[in-house]
Structures are given as structure tokens and as C-alpha cells.
Amino acid sequence: GLMNACEEAIKKENIPYQKGGTYVVMEGPQFSTLAESSLYRSWKADVIGMTNMPEAKLAREAEIRYASVSMVTDYDCWHPDHENVDVQQVIKVLLGNAVKAKNMIKNLIDGFENHIDPKDPTNNCLDVAIITAPEKRTQKTKDKLKTVAGRVLKK
């Protein structure tokens, strides 16, 4: 699936990575306070970020495969051996991560067809997701949603 394709693309770039983990999303842009950072660590969170939700849920609803590749910029403020988060340092790491991400995406595109799974439940999750009865769906609504739900709205 998509995660395996991402992993293969990352390996081609020799980027250190960790597969799996718990992601905490916070509204941003902002940096965590020490109290927030400590709370997230008490939850055993691996990464704290400002994206991924609601994107992951919306992608699933549109039968779009979604994988998160989080490229870390800092340790947040909890780490005793690192200084507090500094915007300039974050930007420097972010720019380096952007280069890595572009190369990873090129590799992902090149090898993606090897990872397509016809049995992936993402292919048909809309079959059981639409609550509105077919006779209650207006043509205007079907036209509006045809790009993301046309397959099931034709039924």
C-alpha cells in the first residue's frame, strides 16, 4: 500500500525514519508550551504537528489513499539537552526537509504502481458511507460531488 511505497521512497534517499507512531495535531502556527509538551509526552505521542487533520479523514471519505510523512524540525521544548525552539533554526531544518521531501516524492511516483493493492478498503469505503437515500439526492448535489463520489452516486 501507500505506506510501503513511502517507506521504499524514503529508503532510496537514505533518510533516517521511524515507521508508525502516534501523531498529536495542534492548531497552529504556534509552538507548544512546556506544559503542553509534557502532556503530549505523557500520552506517549511520537510527533506533534499542525497538519494531518482533518485531511486524513477527508481523504478517506473521498476514497483517496493518504499517508503522513512527518519530517521533524525540533524536539519541542521538553528536551533538557536542547535549547527552546527557535524560529530561525526551525526554518533552516524545514528547508532541508523540503529538499528531502521533494526527492522522496519523485521516488514515490516512480515506484507507486508496484504498491497498488486492488483489495485496499480505501477503494470502496464510500459504498457504506453515504447516509442520504438515493431518492433524496438532488441532481445539483450529485453534480457537485461527482469528482469525489461519482462512482457511488451513479448507483
Regions found by a protein language model. Name each.
Residues 1-80, 88-95, 105-110, 119-155:
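Glycine-rich phosphate- or other oxyanion-binding loops that anchor nucleotides, phosphorylated ligands
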Residues 100:
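Charged catalytic carboxylate motif
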